[in-house]
């Protein structure tokens, strides 16, 4: 359901990889690299177009990633272009590629050995965690961003969605021979290529098959034949000579990029959502000012001493599972980046154990196991195996997430913000912004002292206080109080090797081997931050009751070492929403959407025109991360930065709809229910 089938290949006598699934070569026996350069780079006139290109980024989409040779070659070419034309407005290349049967990393490395000129790029690609999971995975290179979509292109290409209409500059129409892969080469593919292509967008392909040519012409492309590569007589290339048209399938969820003139952006917040949004925007060259109401950063929900880090692998909505899995791997990527930059923070990728401590949790974990995740993501273990993983005896089976673990959120957030200040981030603490007003193409921010600050774009990332403004007051967000207990370690508890999850969690000892974090209470609509003796006791009771053993031979004495008597705890107030899914994107204009969509149920039924969603111009938000901010914030911040800059988004359209800030209103309106 979520994993995809890996490729099965062999090398023929010419050392060319051959697919067993399609019984076809991945590229020419003659010279795969020369073929790639001739067919795709020259066929799309890339170098000539880049020289005169006036936008900040260029987008290439490829219909078959295969060995990654086209990606390596064009990334290398773009690097040469940036070195030769360093003052060009074109700064970045986006490469979107689809792959139904991904090659295992070992085989990629084996094939790339024949192209030593790409050794550094290949190493960087293979260093990333290329998990064969359905959907998009984003990987960063110096001047190039790779969005690699695993799964059938028939399913994934439509998930680029309405947002990507008229945004792709060039297509590498690649894949196995049309006669051997007819499921991909069809009219629907060509129509979607046309839909996503910019006016004057191009395509090129190695084939000259009549059915392909006719399909591309029928879709709207002007198609030309050119000399084929090597022994091939002809191949095709073409252009979209058409006026851009807007044909939106779900206008009520359509995201809108910012109108960027000066790239001057304000972020209101001070936690992990603000951090990753600032990081992604700074990498794009934005001028960022952060406004935090506290004297220090990370004093609220992002301020715990230790926090568990792992994906949510079970949910009634599969969109949420796909989102959290991709968010988890992207967060791992960003944490590794931080470590390489020398940013110090306590962490341990020691794995996370999920306990089947009662019937409900056992059913939940059985469902997770049924998805057949790779063992690098999830392992189903009996009680002996799970006990071995955590280093302490357990009387229950469960699951294990090997790449999960814990990190110190407050330390990570504060130290990474300090690093971002070196990149140009301006931080204003003790600045509570009380009002937002849009006038003269700028947002005017007013603080408690009635001082004002002007910025072109504003991002709200201030947790449950997002709703403090007139523009956001109707969003259905609420505060959730959480008390995390800090307990001393013991000879027994020092043996804990992995994060332990039940109806709560217990972390291994911190780096000083002095204490553990035991969490956490969950009190809705409560933003009180005073210590609670009751919640402290409940944190203790949950672990002792959930994991208590009925087996008298089982030595569970370590549970008695859970000592809360020192009454040390930290209280944070998280932000959540009823469906417990984050919100990210444009801030919706509530009153205007109520007016525009009051009759949307009948408009859809009659197939009448429906306007795009009314939104506050250049105002965005990221919030409701709940207790999973360590996992979700990095990908949400990256997606929001991409949206602001009108770049491709690293999430499928169905997930983006599920993250939309107006989703609760729209769901009611689409059913014919009035909202107030």
Curated annotation (Swiss-Prot):
Region (tRNA (mnm(5)s(2)U34)-methyltransferase): 1-241
Gene3D superfamilies hit by this protein: D-Amino Acid Oxidase, subunit A, domain 2, FAD/NAD(P)-binding domain, Vaccinia Virus protein VP39
InterPro entries tied to this protein: FAD-dep_OxRdtase, FAD/NAD-bd_sf, MnmC-like_methylTransf, SAM-dependent_MTases_sf, tRNA_MAMT_biosynth_bifunc_MnmC, tRNA_MNMC2, tRNA_S-uridine_synth_MnmC_C
Superkingdom per UniProt: Bacteria
GO cellular component annotations of the record: cytoplasm
Named cofactor requirement(s): FAD
Reactions this protein catalyses: 5-aminomethyl-2-thiouridine(34) in tRNA + S-adenosyl-L-methionine = 5-methylaminomethyl-2-thiouridine(34) in tRNA + S-adenosyl-L-homocysteine + H(+)
SUPFAM superfamilies associated with the record: FAD/NAD(P)-binding domain
Entry's EC annotation: 2.1.1.61, 1.5.-.-
Described purpose of this protein according to its UniProt entry: Catalyzes the last two steps in the biosynthesis of 5-methylaminomethyl-2-thiouridine (mnm(5)s(2)U) at the wobble position (U34) in tRNA. Catalyzes the FAD-dependent demodification of cmnm(5)s(2)U34 to nm(5)s(2)U34, followed by the transfer of a methyl group from S-adenosyl-L-methionine to nm(5)s(2)U34, to form mnm(5)s(2)U34.
Protein name: tRNA 5-methylaminomethyl-2-thiouridine biosynthesis bifunctional protein MnmC
The organism of origin for this protein: Histophilus somni (strain 2336)
